[in-house]
Curated annotation (Swiss-Prot):
Transmembrane portions of the chain: 81-101, 388-408
Protein topology in the membrane: Multi-pass membrane protein
GO terms of biological process kind: cellular response to abscisic acid stimulus; cellular response to cold; cellular response to phosphate starvation; cellular response to sucrose stimulus; cytokinin-activated signaling pathway; defense response to bacterium; leaf senescence; negative regulation of iron ion transport
One GO CC annotation: plasma membrane
Organism lineage: Eukaryota, Viridiplantae, Streptophyta, Embryophyta, Tracheophyta
Cytoplasmic topology ranges: 1-80, 409-1023
PANTHER family documented for this protein: HISTIDINE KINASE 3, TWO-COMPONENT HISTIDINE KINASE
GO molecular function, one term: protein histidine kinase binding
Region (Disordered): 812-831
Stored CDD domains: HATPase_EvgS-ArcB-TorS-like (cd16922), HisKA (cd00082), REC_hyHK_CKI1_RcsC-like (cd17546)
Name used for this protein in its record: Probable histidine kinase 3
Keywords: Cell membrane, Cytokinin signaling pathway, Kinase, Membrane, Phosphoprotein, Repeat, Transferase, Transmembrane, Transmembrane helix, Two-component regulatory system
Amino acid sequence: MDEMSCGGGGGGARWKRARVAGMGEGKAGGGGGAAFLGLERVGMVVRMLPVPEKVSARARVVRGSLVAHFRGWRVVRETWWWVLLLWILAGSLGSFYLFLFMNAQSLDKRRDSLASMCDERARMLQDQFNVSMNHLQALAILVSTFHHSKTPSAIDQMTFARYAERTAFERPLTSGVAYAVRVTHGEREQFERQQGWAIKKMYSSSNKKQSSPGPGPGDAAVAEIREPAEEYAPVIFAQDAYKHVISFDMLSGNEDRDNILRARKSGKGVLTAPFKLLNNRLGVILTYTVYKYELPAYARPHERIQAAIGYLGGIFDIQALVEKLLKQLASQESIMVNVYDTTNESPISMYGDDTGSGMCHVSVLNFGDPSRKHEMHCRFEKKPPWPWLAITSSFGTLVIALLTGHIFQATVHRIAKVEDDFHKMSELKKRAEDADVAKSQFLATVSHEIRTPMNGVLGMLQMLMDTDLDTTQQDYVRTAQASGKALVSLINEVLDQAKIESGKLELETVPFDLRTVCDDILSLFCGKAQEKGLELAVYVSDQVPQILIGDPGRIRQIITNLVGNSIKFTERGHIYLTVHVVEEVMSCLEVETGIQNTNTLSGYPVANRRCSWESIRLFNRELHSSEKSFAPIASDSISLVISVEDTGVGIPFEAQSRVFTPFMQVGPSIARIHGGTGIGLSISKCLVGLMKGEIGFASKPHVGSTFTFTAVLMRAHCKGNDIKSSEFKGINALVVDHRPVRAKVTKYHLQRLGVKTELTAELNQFISKLNSGSLTAKLVLIDKETWLKESHCTPLLVNKLRNNDKPDSPKLFLLGSSASSPKGGSDTSREHNLNVIMKPLRASMLQVSLRRALGGVDKVHCRNGVVGNSTLGSLLHKKQIIVVDDNIVNLKVAAGALKKYGAEVTCADSGKKAITLLKPPHNFDACFMDIQMPEMDGFEATRRIRVMERDLNERIERGEAPPECASIQRWRTPILAMTADVIQATHEECLKSEMDGYVSKPFEGEQLYSEVARFFQNHDQVE
């Protein structure tokens, strides 16, 4: 690493080591030539090294790379002066080209700026001109309406002049207006008699040249009587400034005559050529034709000529118009503007001086008359500035090129060091990757190996609990069980984190009942919630299908993690789990409501869950866009929104940004007080991502938190096991609870049982219905908090029910929890002899409670309740069961658990032995098969057993079965997979190997009962 330590011309420690080894004679650090000589000799020695015939391929690659490295180094050292010279030359040419390029860009930018300013002025000039044209056209319509369409006319010279003067602000660009009427030769005499004057013709004072608009002050016009003609256009109305043109025939001037003929033929406004106004400024006349009636747009020219009855003219001061425009658009960089009439070959200047040179831009003007052409020419008043940006940039480029050449030599000498560092880093990177793979494999292996004895420990502890223990010993065993389960949970989290980091975490796709999963989670935290006095509840929307397809284990893991955190950080109030579809949540987001955040499950304020739903907007848009692209695939998908709301301590604002960071907690005190590793939320976020969802939260310190995540699952086309029982169909129930959210939860669980439910908020309403005889409910469920709140009504209610001798009198239930049972309230049910249902509510637990109260038989299948030994004993008594596991401890635990329930157990320590024992015919009723065993795993053993059973069934069908199978129609032994990690035994693998289900190790009463009950009640061998 210290190659450059010897200084000089580039000789270094590397070459010094080569010389010491006898591979060079030059002195280290004695100059570039000596170093180069040593380097060349090293290359020669490398080339001359003998290559053994059996040398490894890696050694050949290393030797080849060394030879190539030394050769490339020598070539660079010999040619670097020429390279430097070429570099400087290229830098000089490049800087010159950069100057030309940037200067051209500057000119183009200046040209574009001029074009933009010129076009803007031209556009505004056209717009202002068009506005005045529109007002003139409106004045023409006014004359047609009130002069020609009224008899007698509503307009005279005084009215016209006054109106024109008072509306002059609408025509700021016109200096005057006049109206001439169309008179034929036959109408002339009568017209002159009506007007009181004769029609005159217009001449200019200089050589009788026609001018417009006629004689005026200062032009010495000669007024002569108009000679006879086919038709005339005498002016009858004019603005006061131009009333001297009244009685003059506008057709007597060539320019005006041509204007009028074009105007009435086209039906549009037409312009004259520029001429000098009375104030010696240039202007034009715009002429509009007035018609007898409104003509369609497609009218022909001869139809327009016949319908013409008059002509309205307006004089425009072009110079004033342009000057006003330039004042409005005064910019930082002024420009010179010239306006030309380019109708003829020789353009006529209408505004501006013709002087000026340099860059020029021409914008075409359109004043509405297609027969006349106008242009605006624009130039900058100032000369362009020096292109300092191009000069400095090109000079800077040249300086950079020289500096680059200056450091080129040092760069060449550092190439070797960089290459060495690169090879070392590559080797370290490979080692790090290998270490990461080894770490993941180690975690997976060690975690599994730890879980196996831990399952044995937990199983033995469970068996120890079934022995005769005193209270102290039971407490010790429960503590050991809790510690063991916590350790297994921690191991599972670490394993999940390792799988996530290695990208090997996969999800199952199996049918499951989400409502049952939620009930199981509530059962898991029921004890902790009651110990802390918390209200714990779940609500699943009716829009959520009963059976979904997804990974129930991972969904359970996410919800369990969120609810567990809420239990951990909540000391009062409630924890509320809700499940909706995305469409329901989106409708809530779009409609803002004024509901207070205290209208909650327990009445405590909560964090606004809308904040945690905001990410769902983006999720919903992405979901719909993907559904459009893959409509056939996404037709069965459903997007769920699952929220966990609590009234805990909340998350400090400064810690909210690192909530999902692995191994991060709010502070060190959290780990001391509540424990945990800080990876639960990180794992949950990764699992949500695998489900194509999003996760977010809203939290307010000292108020609470609401965590929300989305998941995309599939709809199941099969029907699930509906929990609704026929014994509750047609039964009505009344729920009395003053908290709407809590009443909604109770109604949800009752409806799952098929009970029609009505809600009321006060006991008085229930008593009123009871007194009036309008009560149809057979079941009345009153929340204990409401019962205590309205305790003044309870004696009356109890007496009323006791004195009611009717057989159909309602059954009264109190919904109680530790949260709603203050001191002294626990004796309420005992005092009044009431039925009590403890919360949190679950459908199965509620089913059992209602059945007992109604006098039904208490069935044993209770998923969330505690399954007694007698229940499993009735199923497993005298059953022949074989347990297959390669681990002796697991065999002992499984055998002990099954023997506890009266089963006769046979153990096998390998898959091959299981195949031998289960070769039909045999006397076993079921088999519990471990899926991870050496030589042959449980899946392969099961497949071979099924092959033997199929062969026997074919022989039975052909009548070739042995005598032992004479009374059996079809042989099939139930086989259940045993695993420490339920996720590994996926539903697809079980189906492929024809297994019938799975149980987790160690055995738990509830799960064991739910599995074996299916086989020993419905899938027994047919004898």
